[in-house]
Structures are given as structure tokens and as C-alpha cells.
Curated annotation (Swiss-Prot):
Pathway: Protein modification; protein ubiquitination. This is E3 ubiquitin-protein ligase TTC3. GO terms for cellular component: Golgi apparatus; nucleus; vacuole. Disulfide bonds: none annotated. Its EC number is 2.3.2.27. It is an enzyme of class 2 (transferase). It comes from the Eukaryota. Interacts (when phosphorylated on Ser-378) with AKT1, AKT2 and AKT3 (when phosphorylated). Interacts with CIT. Interacts with POLG. Interacts with HSP70. Interacts with SMURF2. The modification Phosphoserine is found at residues 378, 1009, 1060, 1794. A zinc finger (RING-type) spans 1931-1971.
Amino acid sequence: MDDFAEGGLSLADDILLEDYPYEDDCICTPDFTTDDYVRVTQLYYEGVGMQYKDYAQSEKNLEYDICNIWCSKPLSILQDYCDAIKLYIFWPLLFQHQHSSIISRLHPCVEAIRSRAAEISLKKLQHLELMEDIVDLAKKVANDSFLIEGLLKIGYKIENKILAMEDALNWIKYTGDVTILPKLGSVDNCWPMLSIFFTEYKYHITRVVTENCNLLEEFRRHSCMQCVKQGELMKMRGNEEFSKEKFEIAVIYYTRAIEYRPENHLLYGNRALCFLRMGQFRNALSDGKRAIVLKNTWPKGHYRYCDALCMLGEYDWALQANIKAQKLCKNDPEGIKDLIQQHVKLQKQIEDLQGRTSNKNPIKAFYESRAYIPRNSSAPAFRTSLNFVETERGFRKTKYKMANGGDQNQKVADEALKGDDCDCHPEFLPPPSQPPRHKGKQKSRNNESEKPSFNSEVSLQVDLKSILEKQFSKSSRAAHQDFANIMKMLRSLIQDGYTALLEQRCRSAAQAFTELLNGLDPQKIKQLNLAMINYVLVVYGLAVSLLGIGRPEELSEAENQFKRIIEHYPNEGLDCLAYCGIGKVYLKKNRFLEALNHFEKAKTLISRLPGILTWPTSNVIIEESKPEKVKVMLEKFVEECKFPPVPDAVCCYQKCRGYSKIQIYLTDPDFKGFIRISCCQYCKVEFHMNCWKKLKTTTFNDKIDKDFLQGICLTPDCEGIISKIIIYSSGGQVKCEFEHKVIKEKVPSRPVLKQKCSSLEKLRLKEDKKLKRKIQKQEAKKLAQERMEEDLRESNPPKNEEPEETSDSAQRCQFLDDRILQCIKQNADKIKSVVLNTSTLLKELLSWKVLSTEDYTTCFSSKNFVHEAVDYVIGHLIQEKNRVKTRIFLHVLSELKELDPKLAPWIQRLNSFGLDAIGPFFTRYGASLKELDFHVVTVLWDEKYGHKLGSIEGKQLDYFFEPASAMEARCLIWLLEEHRDKFPALHSALDEFFDIMDSRCTVLRKQDSDEMPFGCIKVKNKGKKKKPKDSKPMLVGSGAASVAPSSEAVTPEDHSRRNSDSAGPFAVPDHLRQDVEEFEALYDQHSSEYVVRNKKLWDINPKQKCSTLYDYFSQLLEEHGPLDMSDRMFSEEYEFFPEETRQILEKAGGLKSFLLGCPRFVVIDNCIALKKVASRLKKKRKKKNMKAKVEDISKTGEYLRVKLPLNPTAREFQPDVKSEALSEDVKSIPGPADSSTLAAEDLKAQLDSDSSSGSASEDSRLEVASPDSPTPLCEDASPSPTPAPEEAKPTYWAQSHLVTGFCTYLPFQGFGITQRPAYINMVPSLSQFTSIYTPLANISSEYPMQRSMPVVPSFVASNRADENAAAYFESPNLNTEHDSGDHMASETQILEDTLGVCVRSQGSAADADPALSEPEGNSEHSGSSDSLWEASLENVSGTTDAPAAPSVAIQVSRSMVHQEVNTEPYEPFETQQGDLSQKEKECHLLREQLKVACENCEQIELRSSQEIKDLEEKLQRHTEENKISKTELDWFLQDLDREIKKWQQEKKEIQERLKALKKKIKKVINTSEMSAQKNDGFDKECEPHPDQSLGFSSALTDEKTKAEESVRKGKELYEESHQRAVAAEVSVLENWKEREVCKLQGVASQSEAYLKSLKLMSSDSATYPDVEYDILSWESFLSTVREEIESKKSQFEEHIKAIKNGSRLSDLSSVQLSEVSFPGCSTIHPQFLSESSGHEDPGLVACVDSMTGAVLNDPYMDSASGCPEEVPELSLGSPTHQPEVTQQLELKGASQVSPSEQSPEADEKLSGQATRSSQSPKKPSNSIIEHLSVIFPCYTSTELAGFIKKVRNKTKNSFSGLTIEEIVEKVTEHIVDEQKKKKPNPGKDKKTSEAHSAASVAKSSQSPPLAAAGPSARTKGQKKDDVPAPDGNSCEICHEIFKSKNMRVLKCGHKFHKGCFKQWLKGQSTCPTCGSSDLLSEE
């Protein structure tokens, strides 16, 4: 497995790659499948399930219990169980062999599973998907006890051979999925599917419940660790093979990995991807389905499954599967993007294929469509969803492999993919091509006639191979490389554009999009694989960028771009965004009306959006394309346009053209400033600066702006003088201002004349009306009061006279929005006591689905089930606050038979409210209900109430309007309320039903004066001057308040009388008379109370002036908070003050000193603020500091309390005679020291008194009771005009008078108290004398108190509504959020020990109120010393001295409090009684606190007096109303004047227009007469012209004929020249072909000759041992040359065909001319050559000599540019087939490297060949000659011997001590020197060049293998111009690489350094390399 390679596959592996049959072997006959599952169930029943059988026989209701236990589990766990059961059901169908045993289900690694991929037919796949839909039903209703119980029953029947077909179909119907039943009907036999589903689910649910089996863990334990490791290893190898494009091998590895880990969905997904590449779409479909079943939330599995369906032609099926996948994978944002893209692609494919059919095989069509795509194409494919697939990946690029069955696989080139990693996450790709067919027109794939034959497949493959090979040319790669660069640039520009747009860099974005649009042609957009919508999105991006810039020019261009989208691209679906963009443009221009029109159009086009779009070539989503976001944005814009801001100015120029609007805003894009001209009559005339300049030029002769001062106002009919001119600059600032003060004469105001009644009859009518109104008001109040009392009596059930009801229970009641739920909560204990059968109630609530199965199980699991069930249900209702469930609970209560008769009428009365409200509701909203989709309502009804009230299928909405269907009608309203999100039009109607109709209540306005109107504040009496006081709403009971209809209708006679008697400047119309009277009465009332501008009142009462100013500034500071004296508010308001007010402020020394003269104002940080605001700020700071101190002290105190031992002998532990009484939340005031008791009579009188003075003060008092009466600790606080201090302020004040026993809603206004709902609670049944004061030690802790209080008065105001008395105080130092409950048990200790409250315990428990006795202590309330210290310190500022009472504090244990007083010592702090009360530290601390409290008492009194003043100031709020009414009157008069002036102006304008029109008519008449005369003259002149036109037309016709003739001749000439050009190009290509073929044939002939000579020499193997090896090399070389000849011929023929088809020679790619090198062979010994020269051809010897010395190059193969010689590329054959050529190339490359750069491997190869060529012993001279013959093949052995002799003579006949290499080097240098001395000879240039080149190589190579690997030598016929340099990048003289451009290139092509060439020219005048004398060169 480790060394896995091609050719090494085993037989088993080959079998895996075979073509699998189409027939599916996993779903066979239904009988067998059913038997398989029934056998599984029987096995369970015979073994493990036998106990369940026996138990089922003994217990009939076992399914119900199993169902309850199953449904009691969390929903998430149940859904996981359902997924596991689904795997168990599908395991035999998709993953396992048919005949596998039951053991293999539990141990997949033991038995062989179906790892081998099997195809699934489309019919079988339909059955599988239907089965999957049925199985998924159970997951939807996993926690529905009704349906799960039915499932278990059906499974039980099937297992017992009972036919339950009808039950099964009904079960599926009740689940609500209406799509499955038609599918089941289309299946021939659906019973096997249903039996499998119900039996398997019943089997597994029973296992989970009875055996406590965890299906998830059981499924995960199937694979052992070894299997997991092996599977992971196989997967990694498969990933590697996939990245290498070896998909067949990757399939084998993935298959083996699946054998080890069959539950891994990634493996099936990877294998499906491989099958897609291989073209095996059915196998891919099977694996995709398996991956989905294993994990249905994996997006890639769904993607590949849809791809396989698409490749099979099932486009609609694939689209439906994609929609289902998006719903399942909605929590995966990355995966959902790819699925959305696939969805768009499928939709477009279906649209493209509409109306077109094809009978081709889809795979064959796929090959044909992809045949002409080049293999190595790098052009990226653009995704349909506008996402560009990046081709620059870190992995190797892979290609698609497609096959038409079995192992006949064909590679089809496509875009490269990113290889899978360990878990194999390749990118999603669209299929490479789609067959042009549609699902509706295709036949079954199983049709054998459609399968192509094997011969057709072979021919198809051969054609495809030839086509692909033709495309693998250099030009093709270059073209696609250019395409890739273009797309890269495109992506870069788009990314720059949208990135800049997201970063608000609009100019950069506009630049990028503009550059992009300039380069894109919409007509050629498809050539870039882009859709037209991509181009439109680029246009949209440019428009948005220009819009963001916001300048006028850019806005106009943006508007044009948006209009371009609408006009030219309406089919792309972006009209909505375009209209929205135009609206934004107009909104930027502040043209709100035009913007509103476009926004409205955009709202209507939201549905046309194509979906969520992304920027082209990216994954970045365009946020505006989200429909929900567009909708919200448009609604916001529409709201802004409907209510535009007030313009800063309005241009009055009649010819204003400022962006088609006269409104001037500072935010206008073209805003350039404006001018405002004001006159003394308060006229304001404004102009654009451009309009003002035009007006001055045309009307005022360019008058200077300043000269307009003191001129006449520009307003028509205004006689005022211009007094002020303000010019605003383009920045909105005041540029310059001119002002001239005009003293306006004060005209006395015209007195208001009241119309007096002219007759006594009218006076009598008025008095009668007043009397009637008063009587009606009193009757309405009385009626409302009676109904309120009646309803409250009904809402309060009969009481069982239980005086022990605790007052703390009232404090637990919170105010709820639902009044029915509030009533149930208040009477929870009564309801609990009357419900006798709790189990029946719970079952009914469970059936009505008020309680879930989990809640029902929780109730039953409780030990105290009977007593706590009702409490649990009510608490559950309060927690959910569901109005429907509350009323269902009330309905169930009313239907119970076993109910206490005392409470039954009350419950039935509450329940009947809803039934009574049905009629009015349907009468009012019947039309809206009839517009509903009743089919949807029917489905919802069957789901919710079908099992209780029956189905309403077949009925109409009119059925609910019948009186007999009141219950069903109410249930219908309940159903609409529960699904109100689906019926948005009924929200208000449903709220009205539940808030008003169903829970009857009336909100009345409580008036302090009985003479004021009751319903609303409407003043109809002119003479009534008294202002009504602030109304206080009062919540009363059931019933609707009705006011008697007013009988004020005026008869027509009265109207006539009024009209006749009316006096005044004008008569008021009848329809306005009543409104005018009301307005005048209201105005007279306000003006009579506060006359601001009445000088007499100002002079009479100067204090009232100051008081009014103080009120005004108080209101200003209340609205805006503390303000700086330099604030703009003061300066602006001061400008409008009258002169008298300014004088008052100037006398006081300014505004600041004036305000400080009033105690209401203070200065804080140079800001004026109200004193009460300052006190709040100080208290907040003080509170923060105090809390910090409390925390520190509490920590220290806790440490001292716990860690430090107490000293019992200390002085502080002695009993203290005077104990301080403190309350945590209520402060006490000093009282007489000798008053130790208070009589009950005084107490009663104090309670009954209505006075706010006397004994009741603003602070609560602490009293000490007599020993024989209950100890009063705190007296109830009565209302006072001064507010309570913040430290001990009651949240709601108690009323001083008694009220009846009902709940009243009293929001308190004023007094600085937070306004929250308050309720006056009272217990009428309790005595006022026995329950007012409660002993502190006996306060019950059953209900946790909201505040730590030592007293619970019986009658106070609180925010709790109950029939019992309760007190609720709020202190700012306590956090109300932590009120409930964890410190109640410690409150007694805190109050006794820490605060020192003196408590006199009762003698026995009987003396105390039994209802207040404390039950068993709660352990969770165990002590808190932190709360002790905190409570003691929070009220430091609020404590005062209290009268002392001699007592001994007693420590009470927490566990003993509820029984009686515990007098035992408390260990370990107490050894005897009273020790703990003498704590040293606490007493000292309390004394300090008392001192501080006494010192702060005076400050508190001052503060309270200040607050009293604040309350008095609040009574003067009518000043504000006076100002408002006066302002409104002024506005009314101004509007009237403005309208009159406007009418007058319009009248003048109309008259002027009329005059202008008359003048214009006269002018038109005159001009018409003149034009008629001119026309007569023109007619006379034009009469001869028609004759002349005939001559012109004939001349033009002749010219046209000549032009057409010349065009025809030109076309003929063009055709002839084109044919000649084609013939010429064809002849050129034929000549090139002949030349190349001749070259190769020459090489072939030479090779044949040499091969022939080698064969002749093969007889003498001793002399030439390697002759056989050389013969084989030359034969291989000869065959290669012949193949190359054929290849060149075919290439030239293709080019000739292309030329004939219309292509141009310049556009075609040139034929690659590869150089052919002879193979390297061993050198023939000179002896052999000399011996054979006598009987061999001399030419042959020369040929052999030249070929063995160097590689032969044909002269025709040399390039014309003289480029340096390189190693030739061989395009024929592969390295494995031609080892000789590879060896030759390696040796040649090694020989061209310097000795220092040669590698050891090259040396080894060279030395190896040298040893092979020199195996026989040789003489040194022969070896030297042999070396030299290789270097200088042009010299004979005799000539070389002569050179050796010359060198020996120079060295004085001594070669001793020199090696052969050194001798060869010296001889080589001598030969080169000899050649340089000779003159250049054209006939010998070749030999000189060869010698020089050979010498250079010899110098650079010192090793013996030079004999076998010398440099390339030229043939004798080679030209000197074609001799290349050794290296094109190095100097020919010094052989150094050119590092700069300082070089010289000769005409012959050789290159030299300029310095080297200058040195050479000093002694020579020829080319150093070729000896050319032509030295003309080019730089």
C-alpha cells in the first residue's frame, strides 16, 4: 500500500474500477426489505424485548408512559436521536449488503459493509427520497406526545401482524406535511416503506426508554481505534492521488478508507467528487446521497449530489434538491453562498434549455461540447453567481476526467481545482459542461438502446485525442496566459472599487470603476466568461461612488448612470436599485418630492430583485441587494421625504432656477449662499445669491447691498422700511450684516369686543345647556362608580374569612398588562383552594397544550404534587404572559365539575367576558377576517384545536359568525393571536379584543372639581375662566362608561336666529360656529388668567412679573437641563423679551443675578440649574461614596465579627439603658422623652384625620406601644405638601381618607416622585386597631419583603394590587432589583442588632397575629453580615433620635423564629442572655451614626422647605399654556394676514398676466399677417425650383451608377488579390515543408550510411567492442527522425488547410523546428581507421571521424539570427524510450560547465564512458592522438603527430613528468596559435572556427572523458555567418557573462566586451571567433 503506483494494481483493485451495473442492488423487492426489518424487530422481541412484551400485556397504557418519558427529554437530544435512528434505517439500504446479519449493524468493522460504490437508478432514488421525507417527519414532531404515542401504537400493530395502513396514512396527514401523501399514492406499493418506518422508530424509541440506551454513543462506538487510524491513512493517500489527478487510484483509496470508517461522510463526498471527474455520474449520485444521509447539514455533500443530478439531465430535480439543501444548511454562511450560486446557475441553465430538445447521450454531448478546449488552458471560468474561481492556488492544478462507462476514461481539460487536504475540502465548481437537454424531453438512462457501442467510443476517443494534441501549441498557451492576465487585472480593479466603496473612499472607487468601464465592451462581455449582470453591477458601483462624492457634477453623472441601467438593461432585475439610487440623488439635492416618487417606484420593484448579489469576481455581498435591507432602507427614505425639514430660506425670485426648487437648504450641493432682507414690519425676503444678482442687474441697476437699507420693503403691499440685511456665505456662516434700527410706533391694541346676547331667550338656552352638562357629568360619574364597584366585587371571589392572610402576599403581586392574568394572580390562593381534582386539571391543560410534556412531567415528579400543581401552573402562566394560554386556563377551570361552588360563579363570569365579546368583534372586524386565506387558517386549526374541537375543513368563515359557534369563534381568535406574525393586518384588532373587549375595564379621568367635564377637556362656556386641574386617570372595574348624549342640537330656527342676530365684522359660518366658540372660550380663559402684555397688570403687580419670569426660566431649565450663561438659548430668548422685561433684568444687574435672587436657581460649575437638580446630583455622588464606604466597612466588620474574639468584660458589653430605635427605610423625628405609649384612641383619630398638618409630618414617626397592646414601631405616613427626603421617601403615599375595598390606580404627579402605577390596598375584614402595628419578630418570611421595614401598616399606597394591606417604601440607597428574597430571614436580626430597634417580644405566639407567624426557616436565607453592615450604614444621613424604651435585646436563632421567641444563649458568642446585644464595636458605631443624624436634621428641614417651594411653583403651570395659546393666536392671525396678502398678490399677478397675454395676442396677430405676406413672396420665388431639381436628380443618379460600378470592380480586384495571396502563402508553406523534410531526410540518409558502416564493422568486435550498442542507438535515432518527418508534414498540412479556410499566415503559430542531434557513440580507434582505409570508402571514414568527435548539426537547421548554440530540445519520444539521447544531452551539458562547477555525478558519468571507450591497452602517443582527433577532427593523425613533434621540440624533447592531459593541452595551445598566425581563408574558416571552439572547450575541461563528449562540430559546408558563440550571454574573448549593456555585437552575430574587442583590434582586424573581415556592427 505504501508503494502504490501505476501498473501495480491487484485484481481486486481492477474490479473496483470496473463499470458497475445500473441496476441497484441495495433496494430490491419490497418483500425482502420488509422481511429484513421485521426479522430485526423479531430478534429484538425474542431476546431483549421479551420483557417489554410481557409488560405490554400487563400494562395497556405502556405506550403512553413511554411517550411521556421520551417527550420529557430536551428537544435537541430528541432530534439527535432521530438522526441516529435515520442512520439505522438507511444503513441496510445504502451502506450494507443485503444478507448482512444483525450483528453487522452494531459492528461494521466485523462484517464487510458496502464500501464498493453502487449506482442507484433514478426510480430507486425517488423511493429513497420519499423514504427520507417520511423519516424526517418524526424529527419534526419529536416532542409532540400525541403524535409520538400514535407512532408507537402503529408500530406495535405492525409488529403483531395487524394491518394499520389507514392509521399510518392518518398519522402522516396529522403531521401537517401535505406533500408526502401524493408521493405515496404514486408508488405502487408504499406499505413496505411505512412498515419499515414505524417498526424501526418504535423499536429504537422503546430501547431508549426501557434500556436507557444512548443511540449516539452506540453508533460512535462501532469503529475501533485501529480502524479509525487506518481509515485516516487511506483518506490522506486518496487526497494525495486526487491532487495528482489520478482519480481512479484515489477512488480505490477512498473505498478502502470507507471499509474502515463507513460512518465518515467526508469519504463519500470525496469519492463522489472523483466520480464526477471520471464521468461516472451515477456512482457520484450514490455517494452524494450517502454523504447527505450521514450528515444532512454538510453543504458540499448537497452540492455534489445536485451536480450529479444536473450531469444526468435532471435539472428540475437538482433545483429542488438545492432548495432543500439551503434550508438544511442555513446555519453555514460559507456553504450557503455556494448553494445559492449553484441555484442561480441551475435556474439559468433551465431557462437556456427551454424549448430545445436533444436525443444525444448526455456524456457524449458533454465530450463534444468540451472537445475544443485546450488541455493546459489557464483561462479561469467565471461562476454563474458572479464569483471568480482563483487559479493561483498552492496546490497542483488538476483537470477533469470524464468517462463513458467502465475503465474507458478520457481526460477532458478544464479549469484547475484546488486539491483536497486531509478532510478533502475542494472548492465547489460548476460542472464543466451541461448537455443541451431538458428533463421533460429526456428518456430513461436505463434504456439500453441509448448506450453507445464500444466502436463509437474508441473512435470518439481517437478524434478527441487528435484534436487536443493539435491545441497544445505555444500560441495557445500564450493566448490563454494573456486571458489570465486580463482577468487578473479585472479582478484587481473590481476589488479596488468595492473596497474603496466600503471604506467611504468614493473618489478612489469612482476612479477604479471608471477605468474598468472604459476597458469593458458590453457587446463582448461574454468573451470574458462574464454575464451581462456583471457589467451592470460595475455601472451601479460607479453610480454609487459618484453619489457618495456628492458634488453637483457627480450627482448629475450618477443620475445618468442609474437611468442608463433602467433604460438599457431592464432585464437584469436591478431597476429597484436604480430607482433607489435616483431617489438618493434627489435626496442629496433636497428635492424631496421627486425623491419620494422614485422611492415609491423602487418599493414596488423589490420583488424583481434577482436575489442576494455579490460584486463580480468576488464573494463580497452587495448589502443593497438584500430584499429585507432594501425594504427597511426605502421605508426610512420615504419617511424622511414625507416629512422634510423646514428650509433655511425660500427664494422669492420669480424666475428662480435653483435646481428646480425655490427652497434653500444649507446642505444643498450647489449652495452658494443667500441673502435675507428684513423690514420693520417683520417681513423676511430671501434670495439665492445668483437670483439676487440677477434681480439687482435687471431691476435695481446693480445697486450696492448696503444701499437697500432704509428703503421700501420688497414685499408687495408692505409699507415697511428695510431695517436689516444678512448675507450668508457658501459655508452657511454670516458673511456680512447691515442693520438700521427703526423705532416702531406703538399702536394701542384693539380691545376685544365680546358679542353680547341680544335676547333673553339665548341667555336662557345657555343656562339650560350648562345645567344639562352638569347633570350629565354627575350621572356619568355615578354610573361609572357603580360599575366599578360591581366589577370589583365580581373580580374578588368570596372570602373564607381568613384573617391570618399575610400582608406580604400583596407585595408579591406585580402589575401585569393582561388584566385577566392579573386577576388570576391576585386570587391564586383562592383558586388553589377550590381546585379539588388536580390531575384532571393538568390533563386538560396538557391536551389544550397549555402545558408541555416536560412541564407535565415536572409536576408529576414533585413530591407535593397535589398542593403545588396549581401554583406551578399559575406561575407558568405568569412567566410566559401568554394571553391565549391564560384564557384557556380560565376556560378549563370553568369546565371543571369538581369545583368549589363559592368560586365557580366568579370564574364563569370571567370566562364569559370573552364569549360576550365575540359578537362585537366579528361585527367590527368581519370584513378583515373574510379577507384571510381560510385554507391556511384550516391547517393551523387542525394542528392546534383539531383534536379537541374537530376539524373545520369544508367550512367557511361564516360558520363562526353564528351564535351557536361562539366557542369555536373564540378559539379562532385565540388561533389568530397565537399566529399573529402571519396576520399583520389584525394586530390592532387582536389587541383591542384582548385588552378591551375580553377584559372589561374603563379608564376615567378623575377630576378634583365636580364642575369640570368628565370625558375630555373641551371648553364650551365662554364665561368660564377657571382652568381645569391636571387630570388623574383612575382604573376602575369592568363595564364601559357611557355618557348621556348631549341634547345640544340646534334647530334650524336657532340657526336662523343666530344668523340674523349676529353682529360683528363678519358672520361665522354654521359649521364653524361651535369650533370658534370653543376657541374663543379657551383663549379668553387663558388671557384672563395671565395677561402678559397688559401694561396695567404689569404696573399693578410687579412681583407677578418676576414670578412669571422665574416660572419661564424654570420651565426652560427643566426642558434643557443646566445651561451656561453664555448659552445660545438665553441670547435667543432675550431678543424676544419686551422692553419692560428687559428693564427688570437690567435693574437686577443682569440675567444671572436676577435668577440667583430666587432660591429655585443655583450655580453649578458656571451653569445655571434648578436647585432640585443640583440636590439630586449631590445625592447621587453621596450615594456612590456611601456605597463604597459600606463595602469597606462591611468587609472589616465581617472580619471583626468572625475572626476577632469579643471581650465580655469590656465596658461596651454592659447593658445600655437607652436604646436607639432606627428604621432602615423610615426616619423618625425627635419626640418627647416621657411619651412611652400611645393610646389607641389617639391612633385611630390620627388615622381618620384628613388634615396634612398636626401630628403627621413629612417624616414617619417611631412610636413605642404599651406592653398590653401590639408594639407599634412605625406610623403610617400621611400626605404632606412637602416631599419626603430622598433617603426615606415612600414610593407611593398613603391616602389620608378611607376608601372602599377595591383596587384603585393612582399615578401621583409632582412631589419629585417617580410616577409608577400605585394601588391603594385595604383589608376590610381586619380591625384597624389590631393590624396596624405588627411585632417585628413575628413578620412572616414566607414571602420576601421588597424592603427591610420594621412595620407593615394596614392601609398605605403601594405598587401592588391586592385585597390585603401592604406597605412598600423605596429608598434611593437600596437597589430595587435585589428586593426579592435572599435577606428576609436576616431582616429581624438586622433591625434588632444593627439598627438598634427596640422590640418588645410577645409573651406567647397567641398574642401575635397567626397569619404573621413565620414558617420553617429557609436555609438559603442564612445569615448575612454584609447586609447587616450595609443596612446600618445606608441610612446614616436619615437617622434621628427616637424615644427610648427600656428593653433587653434578645438574640433569636434563625431556625427558631417561626415558632416562638428563643431565649437560649446563642453559641459561641453568648454565654448568658443579653451578651450579644452588648457588642463593643456595633454600639460605638451606632452612637456615631446618631450624632451624625442629629447634625443633619436641620439640613433635612431646609431641604424639605425648598421642596415645598418647588411644589408651589409647579402649581403655576398655566403660564405655559397661556403662552402657547397666545402664540397659537398670533400664528393664526399671521397666517390669516399671509393668506390675504397672498390672495392680493395672486390677484395682481393674474391681472398683470392678463394684460401681458392681451399684448401678446396683438403681437401674434401682427406677426401672423406679416408671415402670410412673406409666404406669398416665398411661393412666387419657389415656383421655378422644382424644374431645377429634376436636372439635379438625373445628375445624381448618373454619379450613383458610376460609384456602384467602381465598387463592384474593386470587389472583384480584392477577390483576385485575396486568391493570389492565399496561393502565395500556400506555396510558402509548401516550400518550408519541402525544406524541412529535405533537412530531415538528409540527416536520415547520413544516419543510414553510418549505420551501414557500423554493421560492416560489427564483425570485428574485439577492435570495436561497443558496436552493437551504437547500432541500436543509431537505429533508434533513425526511427525518431522518420517520426519527426511525419510530424512536420502533418503540421505543415494543418497550416495549409487553415490558410485555405481563411486564416492568415501571420496569425498562425509558427511550426516548432526542433534540432536533431546524433547519438553519442564510442570513438573508433585510429588504428582501425587506418587499417580499413585501404578497402573502405574514404568519405565514410571522414564521416565516421566527424560524427564521433562531435554532435552533427545540419546547416539548414541553424537559426538565422546567429543565436548561441544550446542543448536542442527533443519533442519526439520520451526520456524513458530514448535513454541514449538523454545520456548524450547530459554529457554535453556537463562538458560545457567549468571544472569548478561540475558536479560529482557528471564526473562519474564521464569517467564511466571514458573507461568504456578505452578498455583495451593503448600507447601514450596513441592516446594523445586520439584526444586531439576528438578536439580537432579536421586534422588527420599524421598532421596531429607533426604538431606533437613540434611541441616536443619546443620543450626540448622532454615530455617526462607530464600527464596525457597536460600534453594534450600544450599541443592544443600550439595548434590554436598556428591557426591565428595564418591569414583568414574563406575555404578554411570552418576548420579555424572548429579548432578555436574545440580549443576553448579543451581548456575548460581537464578530464579524459572529452573524447566521448566534445563540443558540437560543424560540417564542412557550414557558412561562417551561422557560427554561433558558445554562450549568447558571455564575451567570446574573455568568456565572462555580460553584466551591463557595455558590449559590442558584430554583423556576424558574435558579442564582445567593448574593452576586450578594442584590445583585439590593436593587433587584428578580423572577428576573433569566425575570422570575418566585415567589422560593421550595431550596438
